[in-house]
């Protein structure tokens, strides 16, 4: 209980959360709770799989381990995953580069004009949903803050904006700008 309180305090203070997972044990319930807190707070996140030096490996080990982590922490598909060894120093220099990248992405600002071009293109590729004969119209999108990057989408009727279409727009924005290791927030107005 006390460790969770300390973890929450650390997450609150952090720009980037490094979730250290035991490479042998995998994602624990407590790891998932801390990941959820970091996600809710909109923190940048890197999942560091530690003890990689003692894990029995073949040519598919990283792929299988990544899939397991992505399955358990499916709510944060944007998180970066790195396989490290604190004991041997394996890939630790890359971890620091990744921290810098995530901080940069979490602070990234995108011009309204560029966002609206992406939205227009996305709408042309996949029409917005409609309900009872009424179609969703997207007027424009703008970024209102960073840490985490937060976007406001102005629409004709926010009841028509389904979470799956918001996710679709998020994916188009990620395709264009990356936002690696960074949660994105969307407000519908």
Q: Where in the sequence are the language-model features?
A:
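C-terminal-of-GTPase-core extension/linker across diverse P-loop GTPases
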Residues: 1-5, 9-20, 24-189
């Amino acid at each position: 209980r006390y460790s969770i309180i300390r973890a929450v305090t650390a997450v609150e203070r952090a720009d980037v959360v490094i979730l250290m997972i035991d490479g042998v044990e995998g994602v624990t319930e407590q790891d998932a709770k801390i990941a959820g807190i970091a996600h809710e707070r909109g923190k940048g996140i890197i999942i560091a799989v530690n003890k990689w030096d003692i894990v029995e490996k073949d040519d598919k080990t990283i792929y299988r381990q990544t899939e397991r982590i992505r399955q358990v922490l499916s709510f944060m598909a944007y998180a970066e995953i790195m396989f490290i060894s604190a004991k041997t120093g394996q890939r630790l220099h890359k971890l620091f580069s990744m921290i810098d990248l995530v901080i940069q992405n979490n602070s990234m600002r995108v011009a309204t004009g560029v966002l609206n071009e992406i939205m227009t293109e996305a709408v042309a590729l996949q029409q917005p949903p409609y309900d009872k004969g009424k179609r969703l119209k997207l007027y424009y999108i703008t970024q209102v803050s960073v840490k985490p990057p937060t976007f406001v989408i102005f629409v004709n009727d926010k009841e028509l904006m389904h979470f799956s279409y918001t996710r679709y727009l998020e994916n188009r924005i990620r395709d264009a700008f990356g936002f690696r290791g960074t949660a994105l927030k969307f407000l519908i107005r």
